[in-house]
Structure formats: C-alpha cells, structure tokens
C-alpha cells in the first residue's frame, strides 16, 4: 500500500539525484546556458549513489525484509548476468556460477520469479532455474525477499528472488553497445575440436546428433541390442567420430547489444509504448584442473587411488537474448503489458585428462588419458501478460492480474567420452600419447550420450487491494490467488563403443579418436562375434513429471499513528506432484511394486501464516520483526529411485522415494537507518528452525565419483547476523573525499543439522557410513563479505569501482567411511570497473575481473580433491545512446 506522505520524505539532495537520473537531456538542452549547472547535478548524484537512493526508497517501504539491487548498481559491479550480480546481495552466495544460496541454504531452499511469475527450468536435475540465463542488459532490478509474506509462494526457505526485466520507457531510447574481452588462461593454443556450422549461434546443426538409422531404432523401441557385428559397424560408421582434440588459438570474447523503445501519447488519456532488446555474447575459457575421485586411508596417511592430476579444458559459451515488451496505459489508472522473452545459453567443453586408476597406474608403467566432450543448449521462452488497474471511484481499489506461459529446453545432442592407455614403451619416464598411446581395449572404450528435456509451465494469478482509513489507522486489505501447472519430459540415450568386437586391434594405437576410427580403418576392420556397439540406456533414463499448485491468500496491512505498521496474513496451498521413471525400451513405468508407485505421487495442503511488525523510530529509521511458516518440497527427480548424473558436478545422484518435505519457521529482526543522499545502514538477525531438512549424503561407490543420495535429516537450524551499509566519504573532508563512497555487506552465520544413520539407511535402502552426524548444512558458508569503493569525478566524465567478494568454506560433499566432509575453499574475487563518459551519448567501460588470479579449490583433510584455474579477465565495452 502507499505509505503516508510524511513517513520517509526525500531529502533535497536525494531529489536532485533522482531528477538527474530520470530527466532527459536533449541536444538543445545540453547546449543551453545552464549547461554547467546540469553537469554539476549529474556529477553530484547520478553515478555516486543515485540508484541506491531509488532502490532504498522501495526497500524501506516493503512490509517484509527485502533487499533490492538496481540496474545501475549491477552496471557498477560489472556483472554480466543475474547470478553474478546476486552474489553482491547481503547473505547470498553463488554456486557453480548458476545457483544462488540465500543465507547458506541450498538452491532448493530458494525460489525464483520473472516479473512476479514462476518460470520453467531447463536443468534436468533441479526445479530451480539457473540464474546465469538472464543477462544483465535486460534486467531493471533484482528483488530478494528474505522474510516470507503470504503473497509469495509457500515454498520458501532462504528467500525469493524476483528478476524484474526492463519495461516501457517514458521517452525514446536507442542504444548500441559492443565489447571485446580476453582471459589470461587463453594465452597460447587451447584445446578444440571440429563442431558444427552453427556453433557460433549456440545451436547444433545436427553434427553431434545420433545418425538417423540409430534414432529410428530408438523410436521403434528396437535399440542397439543384439546387433549383428556388421550391422553394428555400419551404424558406428555413421556416428560423428572427429572429436580431435585439436590445438587452436582462442577467439576473443565478444558481445553485441541493442535496445530501442519509445512511448506515444495518443491523447490526454491513452499512451502506448514498446521496448525491444537483443544481445549476443560469446566467450572462451581455457583452464587447468585437478580431480581426485577415490582416496584411501592407510593408517594416518591418505593415498590417491583414482585421480587425474593433469587436466586441460576449454569451454566455449554462447549466449543470446531477446525481449519485446508492448504496453498500453489509460488515464494512468489502467495499464496492460505484454512481454515475450527468449534466452539461450550454450556450453561447449572439451577436456583432456591424464591420470591413474586402481588397475591402470604408474606402478604398472601406464597412464590413462580421457577425452571428454560435453555440449548442451539451454533455452527459455516465456510469454507474459499482466494488467494493473486502479478504481478511484471505489475508494482507490486496486486489481492486478498476470498470466505467463513458459517453455524451457535442454538439448545435449551428442556428448562423447573416450579412454586411452599410455604405456611407457621407451622406459624414459615420459608418457607420450602420440607415440605410446592406444584406445582402451574394453567393452567401454568410448561412450556417446544424447539427452533432451522439455519443461512447460503455466502460471496465472490475481490480487485485489482495498485501502481504508479510520482515524489514526491507515489500512490496506489484500487477497488473491496463484495457480501453477507444470509438466516435464526427459529422455536419455547412450551407447558404448566396444573395441573387443574387433578381431585385429592393432589399429587402435594412436591418440586421435577420429584417426583411429577413420572410414578407411573401419572399412578394413576384421570383426568377431561381438558387436562394436552396446546400447547402455537403462530403465529410469527417461522420466515424466507433473506439478500443480493452487493457492489463495489474505493479507492485511495496518499503519497506526505514523509509528507502527502491522502486516500479516495466511496462505493456503494445495500442492500435487508426480514423478514417474520410464523404461525407454518399453515406455512403461519403471516401478518395482505398488509401494514405489505410491511414493512417487505426492499431495499436501496446508496453511502458511506470516506476521511482520515495523516500528518507526524516526523519520529515517525503523525496526522490523517478522515470523513466518513455510515449507520446502523435494525436487522432481529427488523422489525417484533412479540414478542420474548432476551436469554441474559430474557426481551420480540417486533420489529417494518417500522423501519428506521440510517444515520451516522463519524469524527475522532488522534495524534500518536511511540517511540523506542514499547513505544507509542496516543490521539484521535471522533464525530458521527446520524439521526434516532435505540434505545430501554420500554412499559408497564402486567406481568413479562418489554416489550422492538425497535424504531427510532429523532437525536443522540456521542463524546469523547481516550488516549492510552505503556511505559517502565526504565525512572525512573535502577534495577527493567528495568523490568517493563505500558500500558493502557482511553476513556471519552458522547452521547445524542432525543426521540419524539408521533412519537414512531405512529411507535410502543403502549403507550410510556417515562420518559426521552433526554438521553444517551442505553449501553453507559461515561468512560472506562484499565490499565496494566507488569514485566519481567532479565533471562527471569518470567513474570507477573496486569490488570485492568472498565466501567462507562450504561443504560440497559430505564425508563417509571416516573421511571428513569435503569443503569448497573461499574464493577471493577482486574486480575493477572503470567508465569514461566523453559526452552525454557515449560510455566506454574497461573491466578487470579476478585480479588476484584465484582458482576454485575443493579439499578434505588438507588434501586437494578438485581444482580449476579461472584466470584474470579483461574487457572493453563501447556504448552509444542515439
């Protein structure tokens, strides 16, 4: 509801800041006699703390605890997407560059909305959407609500992230920008392979796809079982085999963006407008990595059994985005907007890995060499229409509604992995893959996999608001409904190359997969009675899932005597979900018995209340307290017994039928002080009490990476303190201090879960030799620090920011069999962003990221488990506003 006019008035300097941000500067106006005065206003507020003032006004008017980040703040930090930008928000950490952990709680404990609507996810293993899909260029602001309100989805743990896209401008805008970039890890030649003709656009042209003959067999449910040796060889000859690796120079990073929009007054009552944006970015990142898969303990010493100690990788990403918004406004009281959004993020990675296994090791005089190629396209299409209506004749009653339909696709048309063996034939201690290597002589010398996922989601809802004033009480009643329908289908096919099917295997010597299996070699190959292709698609590789939520809520907002604000209400949700693993060969449910079937279908309905109280200590100071009851439900695949590979960690994950929901009671207390010119300070406390928290546990694995199981702990809690500030440094004196400001936030927190070994065994049906039955939650960091120093020149031509971010160590893999938990180590991110404004139309941006050249590390008991270099990135952007 609208706050009383005398609640938090804008100081004169704040008004100047906002005016400088919003007022257009036409060429004629820029040449007027007041030119110097205008430039002085811009220098005073626009880039120093301008948008901070705007977003602070919104934040302090929220009934519940929330943090908001505006477009200019994102621009100052130089972050390229929503995921990177959100790590600057108090208490938020970024995991795998895609998922946000709010207050130390995993991605399943947060929810994401796009313009207030739920959107589908292209991730086959998670319900939540990867936030790196959303480029910064289309974002107007990011809102993170940390305390639950009944108007939000009840599936709320750490918080709710609402990505607000740019809307129709108040006047004509048209700008173009281009950027070039470079990373220090890309020096020299990098790994590469021959892809398709449309890789530049992030789209496979069919090069990687399974040949039509194999696809026809899969469609007809024949698969590749019991093939004749000649038929298997013929099918294999049609498969792409030219995967290198090659040595090529890396292309520079590049990007292009365009925005155009305008609004038109038809008459005094009607206004029309539009906004269109399009962007394209390509990036190449080479890296050096280390990967320990299987350690062993002998006494007090840890020995390495299966590991890759020399890994080179190259990852290419192509992102493109487009947004079109159309709007109509009548008399400033009725507004309807329609938006269509298309986003694409393609990742193409090749890795060359040298290492040892238990049977193939240096002690045996051999090394192994793996070639991995992973290619995936993630695409999101969304249509949204929303309306906002105010009825002055009905005591200014408000009504808003929205409808959204989204479709997300993950397409991995053809990934490949192959294993070579290198023998030290020359006995010189040097393992040369070109002269001493050969393809592994085994049933699985190479593996091809093909994956698709389609996620469709429809979300619609409405809200009514009715303000009412009586004496010293100002009241607003709000009620509404929210409906979500979601359907997902996923398919996975794979086959192995069986080199035991060749009678004469001398031609397997070499280091290039495509040369070994050249057309000439295959044509002259001698076969035995074993087919060279083995279909390794298994039951559970396919699954279908559906989800439906019907929700209604009521909320009331009371102001009393300009001193107190009471906001509370209740939400009722009816949640239904079903997940069914399928046998690809029969297209029938892959269920062992009726008990399994009943556990895969889940339904619950309940009430979720919340209450918030705000006390206004002064005109610019307030104290908030809130309590809310919420729930966190298992992800779609986590209630299926089938095993799948997490594409982000490469760990196998097994779901658990009968997994229970997590009930959470959330407590928040926050003191806020909003001062002139955007300066502010806030201190908050939070506590979350969880019953049956959903957690990751590790089970013993026979070979390869550890097997991760999803299970319920007994109890859990998270608590901590958050401090946030923004302060101009003019308090230290005149001169340069007038041009500087600092901002930042610190979160210090702790968490604890209690696990019961026997209960986990009963729930998962496997051994659970858990090392620590009481530990922190997976992914929780005990501290998160963000700090920024900003500079703006007196003439408004120069702007610079130094930005620092670090998170405390966090558990990634819980330990078993006496091994301690594995921790991802702190990553000290230090970036510099400099902007030059030679005139009112031009912006030149120079950005340096990861100045400290930090690398990602995962350790346990002072033993390195994984590492990956990141390099230092440089980029130069030119933007022109017409």
Where in this protein do the model-derived segments appear?
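Outer membrane beta-barrel strand-and-loop segments of large Gram-negative receptors
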Residues: 441, 453, 461-463, 508, ...
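Structural signature of Gram-negative outer-membrane beta-barrels, strongest in the C-terminal barrel
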Residues: 329-331, 339-341, 377-386, 404-406, ...
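Transmembrane beta-barrel wall of Gram-negative outer-membrane proteins
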Residues: 219-351, 379-383, 609-612
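Short acidic/polar hinge/loop motifs at secondary-structure boundaries
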Residues: 88-90, 117-146, 166, 192-193
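Conserved C-terminal beta-signal and adjacent last beta-strands/turns
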Residues: 6-9, 31, 444-453, 462-469, ...
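N-terminal periplasmic "start-of-domain" segments of outer-membrane beta-barrel proteins
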Residues: 42-73, 107-113, 117, 122
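A beta-strand signature from Gram-negative outer-membrane beta-barrel systems
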Residues: 133-177, 243, 733
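Gram-negative outer-membrane beta-barrel transporters
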Residues: 680, 685-689, 705-810
């Amino acid at each position: 509801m609208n706050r009383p006019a005398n609640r938090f008035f804008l100081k004169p300097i704040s008004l100047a800041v906002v005016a400088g941000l919003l007022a257009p500067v036409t060429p004629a106006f820029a040449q007027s006699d007041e030119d110097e005065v205008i430039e002085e206003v811009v220098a005073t507020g626009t880039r120093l703390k301008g948008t901070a003032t705007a977003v602070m006004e919104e934040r302090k008017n929220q009934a519940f605890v929330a943090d908001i980040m505006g477009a200019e703040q994102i621009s100052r930090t130089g972050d390229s997407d929503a995921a990177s930008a959100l790590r600057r928000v108090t208490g938020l950490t970024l995991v795998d560059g895609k998922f946000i952990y709010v207050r130390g709680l995993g991605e399943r404990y947060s929810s994401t909305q796009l313009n207030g609507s739920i959107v589908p996810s292209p991730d086959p293993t998670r319900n939540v959407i990867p936030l790196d899909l959303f480029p910064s260029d289309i974002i107007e602001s990011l809102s993170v609500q940390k305390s639950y309100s009944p108007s939000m989805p009840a599936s709320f743990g750490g918080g709710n992230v609402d990505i607000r896209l740019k809307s129709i401008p108040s006047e004509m805008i048209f700008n173009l920008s281009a950027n070039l970039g470079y990373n220090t890890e890309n020096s020299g030649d990098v790994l590469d392979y021959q892809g398709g003709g449309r890789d530049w656009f992030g789209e496979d042209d069919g090069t990687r796809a399974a040949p039509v003959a194999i696809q026809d067999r899969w469609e007809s449910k024949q698969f590749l079982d019991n093939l004749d040796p000649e038929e298997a060889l013929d099918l294999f000859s049609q498969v792409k085999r030219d995967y290198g690796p090659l040595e090529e120079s890396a292309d520079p990073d590049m990007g292009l963006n365009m925005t155009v929009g305008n609004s038109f007054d038809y008459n005094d009552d009607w206004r029309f407008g539009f906004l269109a944006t399009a962007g394209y970015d390509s990036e190449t990142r080479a890296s050096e990595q280390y990967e320990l898969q299987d350690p062993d303990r002998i006494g007090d010493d840890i020995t390495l059994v299966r590991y890759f100690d020399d890994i080179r990788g190259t990852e290419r990403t192509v992102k493109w985005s487009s947004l079109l918004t159309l709007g109509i406004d009548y008399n400033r009281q009725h507004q309807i907007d329609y938006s269509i959004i298309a986003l694409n993020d393609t990742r193409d990675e090749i890795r060359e890995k040298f290492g040892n296994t238990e049977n193939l090791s240096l002690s045996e005089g051999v090394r192994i060499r793996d070639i991995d190629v992973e290619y995936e396209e993630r695409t999101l299409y969304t249509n949204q229409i929303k309306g906002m209506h105010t009825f002055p004749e009905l005591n200014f009653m408000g009504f808003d509604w929205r409808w959204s339909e989204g479709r997300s696709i993950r397409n991995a048309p053809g990934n490949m992995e192959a294993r070579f063996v290198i023998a030290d034939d020359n006995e010189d201690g040097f393992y040369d893959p070109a002269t001493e290597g050969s393809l592994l002589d085994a049933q699985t010398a190479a593996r091809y996999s093909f994956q698709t996922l389609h996620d469709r989601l429809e979300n619609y809802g409405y809200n009514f608001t009715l303000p009412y004033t009586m004496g010293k009480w100002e009241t607003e009643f709000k009620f509404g409904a929210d409906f979500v329908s979601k359907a997902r289908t996923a398919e996975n096919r794979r086959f192995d190359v069986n080199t035991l099917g060749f009678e004469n295997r001398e031609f397997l010597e070499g280091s290039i997969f495509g040369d070994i299996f050249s057309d000439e070699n295959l044509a002259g190959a001698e076969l035995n009675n074993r087919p060279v292709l083995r279909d390794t698609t298994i039951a559970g590789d396919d699954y279908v899932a559906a989800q439906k939520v019907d929700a209604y809520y009521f909320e009331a907002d009371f102001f009393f005597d300009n001193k107190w604000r009471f906001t509370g209400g209740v939400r009722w949700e009816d949640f239904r979900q079903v997940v069914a693993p399928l046998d690809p060969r029969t297209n029938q449910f892959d269920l062992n018995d009726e008990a399994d079937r009943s556990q895969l279908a889940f339904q619950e309905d309940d009430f979720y209340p919340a209450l918030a109280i705000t006390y206004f200590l002064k005109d610019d100071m307030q104290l908030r307290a809130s309590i809310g009851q919420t729930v966190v439900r298992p992800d779609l695949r986590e209630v299926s017994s089938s095993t799948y590979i997490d594409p982000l960690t490469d760990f196998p994950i097994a779901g658990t039928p009968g997994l229970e929901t997590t009930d959470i009671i959330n407590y928040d207390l926050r003191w806020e002080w909003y001062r002139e010119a955007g300066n502010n300070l806030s201190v908050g406390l939070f506590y979350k009490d969880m019953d049956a928290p959903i957690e990751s546990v590790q089970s013993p694995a026979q070979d390869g990476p550890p097997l991760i199981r999803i299970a319920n702990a007994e109890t859990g809690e998270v608590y901590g303190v958050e401090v946030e500030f923004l302060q101009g440094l003019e308090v230290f004196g005149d001169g340069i201090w007038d041009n500087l400001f600092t901002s930042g936030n610190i979160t210090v927190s702790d968490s604890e879960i209690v696990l019961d070994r026997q209960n986990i065994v009963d729930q998962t049906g496997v051994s659970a030799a858990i090392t620590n039955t009481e530990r922190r939650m997976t992914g929780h960091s005990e501290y998160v620090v963000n700090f920024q120093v900003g500079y703006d020149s007196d003439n408004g031509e120069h702007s610079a920011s130094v930005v620092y971010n670090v998170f405390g160590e966090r558990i990634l893999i819980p330990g078993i069999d006496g091994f301690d938990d594995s921790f991802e180590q702190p990553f000290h991110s230090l970036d510099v962003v400099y902007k030059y404004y030679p005139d009112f139309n031009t912006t030149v941006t120079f950005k340096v990221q990861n100045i400290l050249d930090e690398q990602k590390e995962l350790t346990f008991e002072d033993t390195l488990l994984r590492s990956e270099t990141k390099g230092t990135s440089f980029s130069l952007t030119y933007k022109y506003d017409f």
